[in-house]
């Protein structure tokens, strides 16, 4: 389900701006250079305008030399402003790109720390939208708008001060016009900000839907779902259009309103200033300088108004990004870790830095417990949502080297049990014990290093065949990779590929068959060499020959390990040490194949095709 965002309270705006400034503040020297150059550029523009006054006055009673020197000096001051503007632009680009790098890095790192339950409620397109749409809007604002808004603010403030210095009476009129402009900008900004927030949320939802439809094109076409998918897309696109129209409508009215007010302001000041000059209460130079200031005042206000629209869009994106980064990460209070061990002269285990292939659990007090693969469920209760239990009082025992199979219809709780072993989720009642240790006391990284998984939906990554197998053990040698491929019965098909183990795999393994992807998944688990395996059986979608290869690979992989199998075909679990039959989150039958058939219960009915097994 796509994530929905409502408009934030005003206090969130200050938090978001402060956090963005914090990222830029990591580069203090560059950030200081930006602030200094922006200030100098704005002051130079103000000073150049003020210097028009003596230049004009020099025409009345002054010398030609005074006039020329005044023009040259004024041009030099403006030149300094231009050079500073070029300088702060380059510095700002550097600061912005460094800050964006940090934001992307921190966002991605935080995503890796979030629990699976966070991803369960979001589609991939919406998650991707944080990195693309939201971060891109931040990039546009930091690269182009941030420094301009600061310069505009300094220039507006400085202009107002200079206007009061030149003539405070006329400046009262200007101040009233300024106030009217800012009141309108504030009103429009607040209204458009809510729409910008909604626009970013709708954009993420639309991206997610597009990704779903692109990935599922075969299903869409098989079921003639094209028209229905277009209708859904149109509805989501219309929601985005509505939010975008609302945001841009308010934003678009700001500049014309500001321009209109500035023209009225200029006309009033020009008339009144001219009257003052005719009466001798204001000299020509002051009037000329004053009118230029008034005219220039419109430029930073227009610029501020225009860039503030981009900033509002960026802040809406930044709020979404920082909301994700503020999500509570996956908790890990375990203190027991997995370490390499070797036997001492007295036969006792001791920790070593060498890769011995022998492992043990090291408790916080230093006690070493051999890694054996002994797994117990003791009266485990669990539910994905409060008040909706999925498992009820699950108790089972898998001795080292045993094969435990789970069978039952869809939704019975088979996959949920395996998710609790590796702590993708934590139990809500009872406990899961691994080698006599509560899994909640084991550091998750160590726990998952001791487990291997072969899932029904095989996920491969862009890279070579070898890289995908090495994903199970990042420091695996080429020899270990090839040995794992042989265990999985994948070596022969890999060597028939044009580049063998160096063949590139496209995203999600689209250039390989379903069976080949499953064989690589088995090889990936084999190279990790874990004592405990979780297998989500998936042989129904491949041909008979490939199915036989997969079964042989599975059998080799399971040798000498504790194995939990989610069975989809009862013919493959006959040799299991124990079969757990689940129904509505409870183990309703248990025993080996022959015992369960003799009971003539649910397993018997499933085996004889009286009920569907999935």
Listing of model-derived features with the role each one plays in the protein:
Residues 26, 116-117, 135-142, 146, ...:
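An intracellular "coupling" helix at the cytosolic face of ABC transporter transmembrane type-1 domains
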């Amino acid at each position: 389900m796509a994530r929905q965002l409502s408009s934030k309270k005003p206090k969130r705006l200050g938090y978001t701006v402060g956090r963005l400034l914090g990222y830029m503040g990591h580069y203090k020297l560059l950030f200081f250079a930006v602030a200094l150059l922006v200030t100098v550029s704005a002051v130079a523009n103000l000073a150049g305008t003020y210097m028009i006054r003596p230049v004009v006055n020099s025409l009345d009673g002054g010398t030609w030399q005074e006039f020329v020197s005044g023009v040259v000096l004024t041009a030099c001051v403006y030149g300094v402003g231009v050079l500073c503007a070029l300088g702060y632009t380059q510095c700002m680009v550097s600061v912005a790109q460094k800050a964006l790098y940090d934001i992307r890095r921190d966002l991605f790192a935080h995503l890796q720390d979030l629990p699976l339950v966070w991803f369960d409620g979001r589609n991939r397109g919406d998650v991707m939208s944080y990195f693309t749409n939201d971060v891109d809007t931040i990039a546009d604002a930091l690269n182009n708008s941030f420094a301009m808004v600061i310069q505009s603010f300094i220039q507006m403030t400085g202009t107002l001060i200079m206007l009061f210095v030149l003539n405070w009476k006329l400046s009262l009129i200007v101040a009233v016009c300024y106030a009217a402009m800012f009141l309108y900008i504030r009103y429009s900004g607040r209204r458009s900000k809510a729409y910008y927030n909604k626009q970013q949320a709708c954009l993420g939802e639309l991206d997610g839907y597009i990704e779903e439809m692109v990935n599922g094109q075969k299903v869409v076409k098989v079921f003639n779902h094209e028209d229905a998918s277009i209708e859904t897309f149109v509805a989501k696109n219309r929601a985005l259009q509505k939010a975008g129209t609302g945001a841009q409508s308010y934003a678009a009215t700001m500049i014309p309103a500001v321009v209109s007010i500035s023209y009225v302001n200029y006309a009033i000041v020009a008339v009144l200033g001219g009257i003052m000059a005719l009466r001798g209460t204001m000299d020509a130079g002051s009037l000329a300088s004053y009118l230029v200031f008034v005219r220039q005042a419109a430029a930073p206000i227009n610029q501020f108004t225009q860039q503030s629209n981009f900033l509002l869009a960026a802040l809406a994106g930044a709020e979404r990004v920082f909301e994700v980064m503020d999500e509570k990460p996956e908790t890990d209070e375990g203190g027991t870790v997995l370490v390499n061990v070797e036997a001492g002269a007295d036969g006792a285990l001791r920790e070593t830095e060498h890769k011995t292939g022998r492992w043990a659990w090291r408790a916080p007090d230093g006690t070493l417990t051999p890694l054996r693969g002994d797994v117990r469920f003791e009266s485990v209760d669990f539910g994905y949502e409060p008040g909706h239990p999925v498992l009820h009082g699950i108790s089972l025992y898998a001795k080292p080297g045993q094969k435990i199979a789970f069978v039952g219809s869809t939704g019975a709780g088979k996959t949920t049990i395996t998710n609790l072993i590796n702590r993708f989720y934590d139990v809500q009642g009872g406990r899961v014990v691994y080698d006599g240790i509560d899994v909640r006391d084991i550091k998750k990284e160590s726990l998952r290093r001791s487990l291997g998984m072969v899932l029904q939906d095989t996920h491969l990554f862009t890279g070579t065949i070898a890289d995908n197998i090495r994903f199970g053990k990042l420091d695996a040698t080429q020899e270990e990779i090839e040995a794992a491929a042989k265990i999985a019965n994948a070596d022969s098909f890999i060597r028939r590929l044009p580049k063998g183990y160096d063949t590139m795999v496209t995203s999600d393994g689209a250039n390989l068959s379903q069976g080949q992807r499953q064989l690589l998944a088995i090889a990936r688990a084999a190279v990790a060499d874990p004592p405990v395996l979780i297998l989500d059986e998936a042989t129904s979608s491949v041909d008979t020959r490939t199915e036989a290869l997969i079964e042989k690979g599975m059998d080799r992989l399971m040798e000498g390990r504790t194995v939990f199998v989610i069975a989809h075909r009862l013919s493959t679990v006959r040799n299991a040490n124990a079969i757990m039959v689940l129904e509505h989150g409870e183990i309703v039958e248990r025993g080996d194949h022959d015992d369960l058939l003799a009971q003539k219960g649910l397993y018997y009915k499933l085996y004889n095709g009286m009920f569907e097994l999935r």
